[in-house]
């Protein structure tokens, strides 16, 4: 008999008021087969990875069986999608429970592509293999980069075909998150006009993510401030690695501060603040350079839901919310500048740093330089290999950089070490991702996906094996389009 997988399930979300979710029975799939499995994550969750890879374990990962203590439900939420408010919910995902780890932490276990729910809005509730492999690959790459993110435990094919303009193999992704509470969850509660529901949800969020706030003078204001702080940190980290989320709707902003929803995301090759990849972002609302402002806007929508809880007087509540939101920009800029200094081997701050960095970025834009490789080449001491080489302004900037480093107490070797730990040698290059996914979906060969996952686990290794994955595409990124996969 296969050893138990060691699920240690609860579902605290199911104890919230009924409007926040819909209880469902799983939609079993015909012939589940394990394609990808994240053994280190399973171990961290206190699970028996070997048992999970056996047929009984795969049945859970496919949604055919719910472990004891679990309770399948689809979460309700709302959201501003490209600025337009609408009621939403999990249209193709089920929260089957919360795994309590050996050290007492709690993580959502969600099955994505698990079938229809009351929130499917006419969709089939299923997912195609390609987008599920893509989320596994990129979410785990983000984790390796040190960026807060939901994780991927497994991808299972269903043995069933789904229709997305053509027939495609169906799949289920097991997503792991600190929680799936979203700004949109609060908008859903507020949109129903039930202040008590908003309070219940806020109390739950505090208990789940910020228990230290329960005793603060105004716990709901503290909650708002903490979410702002986490998001300012998260967005700065996106910008530092050239990550373009692609669909920054309010339902895709988490209360935990994790990156969520990897549908149309991609990493920028050539540096350009106007970079957009998503097929549906025709106006560039969620372009790379707009992400901080959009995050600020989303957080303002979160603040609006909390106003009745901040103070008895509405005017006072609005003032408190506005004051908190105004703090986002300063926190974001501070985080981003601190991060960009590390990318340049700078240990201390100086007054002219922002102008100094912006000059480099302007030159990168003008010369169509690759974002990741520019910092990689500076780290390797090879500025002559960058796209700006030979430009007089770049020579001036290099001289300023050398002078800037010479004014700090740390040695050049220490500066280079700092750069190596903050400038990835490899990112999920769009052409490499597409190459791997095409092989997996069209040829049923998952070897390239597994190779890419292995390389991306060590983004700061600077190894010879990574050279192929650091190469820029032969054709520039203009015209590269991503799709949400729904």
From Swiss-Prot:
Mg(2+) binds at residues 252, 261. Keywords: ATP-binding, Magnesium, Manganese, Metal-binding, Nucleotide-binding, Nucleotidyltransferase, Transferase. GO terms for molecular function: AMPylase activity; ATP binding; magnesium ion binding. ATP binds at residues 89, 91-92, 112, 124-125, 175, 182, 261. The keyword ATP-binding applies. The active site is at 251 (proton acceptor). Signal peptide: none annotated. The keyword Nucleotidyltransferase applies. Pfam families: SelO. Disulfide bonds: none annotated. Its cofactor is Mg(2+); Mn(2+). It catalyses: L-seryl-[protein] + ATP = 3-O-(5'-adenylyl)-L-seryl-[protein] + diphosphate; L-threonyl-[protein] + ATP = 3-O-(5'-adenylyl)-L-threonyl-[protein] + diphosphate; L-tyrosyl-[protein] + ATP = O-(5'-adenylyl)-L-tyrosyl-[protein] + diphosphate; L-histidyl-[protein] + UTP = N(tele)-(5'-uridylyl)-L-histidyl-[protein] + diphosphate. Belongs to the SELO family. Nucleotidyltransferase involved in the post-translational modification of proteins. It can catalyze the addition of adenosine monophosphate (AMP) or uridine monophosphate (UMP) to a protein, resulting in modifications known as AMPylation and UMPylation. PANTHER family: PROTEIN ADENYLYLTRANSFERASE SELO, MITOCHONDRIAL (PTHR12153:SF15), SELENOPROTEIN O (PTHR12153). This is Protein nucleotidyltransferase YdiU. It comes from Shouchella clausii (strain KSM-K16). The lineage of its organism: Bacteria, Bacillati, Bacillota, Bacilli, Bacillales.
């Amino acid at each position: 008999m296969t050893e138990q997988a060691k699920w240690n399930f609860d579902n605290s979300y199911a104890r919230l008021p009924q409007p926040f979710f819909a209880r469902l029975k799983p939609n079993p799939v015909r012939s589940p087969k394990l394609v990808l499995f994240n053994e280190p994550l399973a171990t961290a969750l206190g699970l028996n990875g070997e048992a999970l890879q056996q047929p009984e374990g795969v049945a859970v990962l496919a949604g055919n069986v719910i472990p004891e203590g679990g309770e399948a439900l689809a979460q309700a939420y709302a959201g501003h999608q490209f600025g337009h408010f609408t009621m939403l919910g999990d249209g193709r995902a089920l929260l089957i429970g919360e795994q309590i780890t050996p050290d007492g932490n709690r993580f959502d276990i969600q099955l994505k592509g698990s079938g229809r729910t009351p929130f499917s809005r006419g969709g089939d509730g299923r997912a195609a293999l390609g987008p599920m492999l893509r989320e596994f690959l990129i979410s785990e790459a983000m984790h390796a980069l040190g960026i807060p993110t939901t994780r991927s435990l497994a991808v299972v094919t269903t043995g069933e075909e789904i229709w997305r303009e053509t027939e495609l193999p169906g799949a289920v992704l097991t997503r792991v998150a600190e929680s799936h509470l979203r700004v949109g969850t609060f908008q859903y509660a507020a949109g129903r006009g039930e202040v008590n529901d908003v309070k219940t949800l806020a109390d739950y969020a505090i208990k789940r993510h910020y228990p230290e706030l329960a005793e603060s003078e105004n716990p709901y204001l503290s909650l708002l401030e903490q979410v702002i702080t986490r998001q300012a940190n998260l967005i700065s980290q996106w910008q530092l690695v050239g990550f373009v989320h692609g669909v920054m709707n309010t339902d895709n902003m988490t209360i935990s501060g994790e990156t969520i929803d990897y549908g149309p995301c991609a990493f920028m090759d050539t540096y350009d603040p106007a970079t957009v990849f998503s097929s549906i972002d025709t106006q560039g609302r969620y372009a790379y350079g707009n992400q901080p402002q959009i995050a600020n806007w989303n957080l303002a929508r979160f603040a609006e839901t909390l106003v009745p809880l901040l103070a008895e007087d509405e005017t006072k509540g609005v003032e408190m919310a506005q004051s908190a939101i105004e703090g986002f920009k300063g926190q974001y800029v501070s985080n981003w500048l601190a991060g960009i200094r590390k990318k340049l081997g700078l240990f201390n701050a100086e007054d002219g740093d922002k102008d100094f960095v912006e000059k480099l970025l302007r030159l990168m834009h003008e010369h169509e330089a690759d974002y990741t490789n520019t910092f990689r080449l500076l780290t390797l001491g090879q500025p002559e290999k960058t796209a700006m080489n030979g430009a007089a302004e770049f020579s001036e900037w290099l001289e300023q950089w050398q002078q800037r480093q010479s004014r700090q107490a740390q040695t050049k070797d220490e500066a280079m070490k700092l750069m190596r730990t903050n400038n990835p040698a490899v990112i999920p290059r769009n052409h490499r991702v597409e190459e791997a996914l095409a092989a997996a979906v069209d040829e049923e060969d998952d070897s390239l996906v597994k190779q890419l996952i292995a390389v991306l686990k060590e983004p700061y290794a600077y190894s010879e094996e990574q050279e192929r994955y650091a190469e820029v595409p032969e054709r520039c990124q203009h015209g590269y389009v991503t799709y949400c996969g729904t």
